[in-house]
Amino acid sequence: MIVMLCVDDKYGMMFNCRRQSQDRVLRERMQKLTGGKPLWMNAYSKKQFEDSSNICVSEEYLEHAATGEYCFVEDQDITPYAARIEKIILFRWNRTYPADVYFNFELLSSGWILKETEEFEGSSHEKITEEVYTR
């Protein structure tokens, strides 16, 4: 599976049971990246997406996603699923928000290599950085 996560400068993902931020252009970019393949997420994340035929919703989405399928992760630790992850795509907000849920960045030091970096302008963020990690 290919996981996509949004993080701040300190790898924060959520605060007080809410996402730190969101961006319309980023959501459109995620949809393009999938190329129509399934995009798995939980019901909380689905609320920010338009109806789309490739979005699959399940609270156990990280268990259901198959090879080559995408997962948008906002509020879970992906470490238990590391063996099944083919690629990690981090979208950096390039700012710091309050956070109490974090991405376990130590995972990236276990054989992951930064392959691509690209910056783009979002709808509510001047600069979002996309980082693609592979093994």
Where are these regions (language model features)?
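Enzymes that bind and transform nitrogen-containing heteroaromatic metabolites
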Residues: 1-135
